Amino acid sequence: MTTLIDSALLGLIEEAGTAVAILTEGLERAELLRSRLTRAQVLQQLKTLASSMTQVAPAARGELPELDWLGWDALNPRLNAPPGEVLDEALWFACEAMVPATLLWLRVYRQNQPELFRMAL
C-alpha cells in the first residue's frame, strides 16, 4: 500500500520524467550534450527523478514491479558524477531508455491502479 509520501514521490517522478521527455524531444545525443541550458535543465530533472525513485518505500515499489527500481538506484550516483564521460553516458541513457520506459509504466499503473497516485489521507 502506498503512503501519502510515496504517492507524492510518484507524482514528482512522473512530472520530472515528462519534463525530460519534452526537453529532449527530437534531440540527438550530440545536440543534448552541446546545449548548456537544455543539458543543465535535463540533468536537474533527471536528478530529481532518480532521487525520488530511491526514496519510494520498498512496499510501494512492490506495487509497481515493472519500474526499473534497481536501474534507477544504479543510475542515481552516475547522474551526480563530475562532468565527463560517465555523466554524459548516464545522461543519454536516462533520456533514451530509462525515462521513456518509466513514463510508459507509470501511465499503465495510473490507468489500472489510480489509488497509487491518489494523495489523500
Locate the predicted segments by residue.
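Solvent-exposed interaction patches of small proteins and small membrane subunits
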Residues: M1-L121
